């Protein structure tokens, strides 16, 4: 092995050779285009390359390739470190949210696991269970991080799948076996196992879409919501009310879609929990409930009280979102007996890689601003009539968010809209409506692909996906009815409900114009 071969083996680790080569080519081309052709073209090239790294997140986590491209952009002068720092400081609350709120919810997983386990065992109707999962995921995602909600549901599904797989393989529950190996499955259990997989697939997808339905509603539902709220100067309640003319109709239609796909068994939905599996899981739940000590019950009670504090703290904006998250960490660890530094450290593992990636986003945003990359698009949109502007912003956001990361897309568009407001191109009232269009456009159509929704990508890359045969293509197919309904209802609400509803809410004094 030559030195160059050894270097390329190390470079970006286990990523495919073609992917490594593509990143190297990007790094070589960008300075040439910037210095000898056009900084504007080089800027767009960087944005396209960065979107490519996000779309290829399954090949390599975007932090490394995206970070290399961003560092090179700063070195060659597309932007500067001072501007990157300014972008980071302008969005510091989002960084606090990702660091502390996600970690805080980690210590409340026991309560969430308990709730979803009870739902699965107690509700026998598949339609009712699907709606309950979708609604619960939506409600939780309005206050908690969507990744955490999905992580909890994955934990429940993994636990139940593991239990049934062991029984179907003829093993005891305490046996350590490979649940990805189907070779020992008893012949008559094969069909039941396939039905159970289809059942779990549908539940996971309903819950995933639920996180999008709830996440769009509040400041803390998604990281990009807080970025938009910061620019528009909206607190928790005002953000909720501003979004409500769009998010409430979409939420109702989302639950209706959940009902219809289950009722008529469309797009891979409708499979019920086999009775044999339910009996095994029900017996296990009963055994676990009987084993629960008084100490365990007190832990659940404390976590429920902390959840109430979380909702009250956010609703009345008692502190910055990230600081409320820090208080959750302190309360949850203090009252459930978690005092070991290494155990506490595990809570931060989920959020810190994405927090680092977010800082790279801001570097690319700085390039977009310095090179005025979005000026032609924004000029085109803002030259349209005011009502058409809302639909165009919604559609452009939705299209880009379905293939790229929605935090990145929302940051770019809200910055451009704020610049238009500052320069007197649009009126304050129009900026407020555009902010709603950007938020809903970023959050709703992005359920189309795993690239658009972090929760979907997390589900796709989790260990449960291969077990229940949930591939990228199948996920896109199962999300299709939701994509169509959420996108169209969102667009219609933006066009026909939002302007009049905003004026009505302002007349009641529920929202305050800028």
Swiss-Prot record:
Protein name per its UniProtKB record: Na(+)/H(+) antiporter NhaB
TM region(s), chain numbering: 21-41, 43-63, 88-108, 143-163, 203-223, 239-259, 304-324, 349-369, 390-410, 448-468, 484-504
Intracellular or extracellular location(s): Cell inner membrane
Free-text function comment from the UniProt entry: Na(+)/H(+) antiporter that extrudes sodium in exchange for external protons.
One GO MF term attached to the UniProt entry: sodium:proton antiporter activity
Protein's UniProt keywords contain Ion transport: yes
Keywords: Antiport, Cell inner membrane, Cell membrane, Ion transport, Membrane, Sodium, Sodium transport, Transmembrane, Transmembrane helix, Transport
GO cellular component: plasma membrane
Its membrane topology: Multi-pass membrane protein
Domain of life according to the entry: Bacteria
InterPro entries: Na+/H+_antiporter_NhaB
Catalytic activity: 2 Na(+)(in) + 3 H(+)(out) = 2 Na(+)(out) + 3 H(+)(in)
Name of encoding gene: nhaB
Family the UniProt entry places it in: Belongs to the NhaB Na(+)/H(+) (TC 2.A.34) antiporter family.
Species of origin: Haemophilus influenzae (strain ATCC 51907 / DSM 11121 / KW20 / Rd)
